[in-house]
Amino acid sequence: MTRRSIPGPRRAWALVVVATLVAACGGAGSTPGLGGTSPDPGSASGASASPSGVPSAASSGTPPPAASEGPTAAATPGEGEFANPVIDADFPDPHVINVDGTYYAYATTGGGKNLQASMSEDLVEWEMLVDPLPELASWSGLTPLFSDAPHKATWAPAAAQMDDRFILYYTTPALEMERPDGRPSQCIGVAVADDPTGPFVDESEAPIVCQADLGGSIDSTYFLDEDGSQYLVWKNDGNCCGIETRFYIQELSPNGLELLGEPTDMGVANDTMWERNVIEAPTLIARDGTYYLFFSGNDFASAAYAVGYATAEDVLGPYEDAEENPIVATERPAGGPGHQSVVEDEDGDLWITYHAWDVSHIGYQNGGRRAMWIDRLIIEDGTATVEGPTAGPQPAPEAP
């Protein structure tokens, strides 16, 4: 019998995850996220079927804890250095934008807010802000899945600047749109503000997109192409209902509030070992004529959660997975790093932002929280690499 070997990068990723978990668990007991986490009852995939940023009913019946021990740096950073995490609090699914040298980060619901927000002058020191989206659209509301939550469930925000105003895309339940398992679909809304801190207002009467027959639509991000065309990128929430997960792209109207034409399947599916049954959190950038689609895969409440990417020569695709995936994976003390965004600093350097658990406290059911990390993203000769996860001191953004 011929035995197939696992490709080198994926074998290394698997060994890192297993070794880290064995060390974290003392070599005994169940491994969180690798057979030790119960799947959502409504999911046929076996992975967490809850939306990114919100614990599944199976893994946690309560909102995220107010505090727990987060990842800690190995040493104290010196002058011109920093250490992860840069936001040492529960700040899941972080999306960061640069507005004239000031950085704004948006994150999934927490602390009684619909969404969280923070601002920084250097990507390292962050100041927490008020809820940027204090009111949701009329079509949004609580669902049975989130009936115990003290506030409406909103997550995975992504902001963009359009001329003199700001647009915020976010995911929330749409009560009138039933998905195949009979529950309300998770759909994408869009809100507008005059300032990046908000308040963002959503006056729409329906989601900007909601593929209810495909499980719903979540994890949207904005992309501005070099020719001025604007696009919305998202995933269908197929893992809710045993449906294949795909990424989609569709052109936006000039004001960013409507979609034009029809969505295009970007050609990436949850079909590789490291992704297990879930891909999510698409982030699209362009460099030197190549389009890079970053995304996360696997169960977000596990050490197997990681970041990969795919490339294409056309913005609509088809995109092809990089052979070296995943490029950001569990590495002590960062557990299950993912749901990334990419931001360019004032020197033109790229940074990937993502959340990560402390490897010894992965999952809300284990007292964990998802802190925000940043690491350098290097793109050379069509290949993307990340210098991380890095917990120890490293040169700070814009540092000489």
Residue ranges of predicted features:
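Residue-level detector of alpha-helical transmembrane segments in integral membrane proteins
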Residues: 2, 56-58, 87
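Bacterial N-terminal signal peptides that target proteins for export
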Residues: 2-14
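C-terminal motif of bacterial Sec signal peptides marking the signal peptidase cleavage site
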Residues: 21-24
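Carbohydrate-active catalytic/glycan-binding domains of CAZyme proteins
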Residues: 26-27, 32-34, 63-400
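Ser/Thr/Gly/Pro-rich low-complexity, disordered linker/stalk segments of secreted
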Residues: 36-76
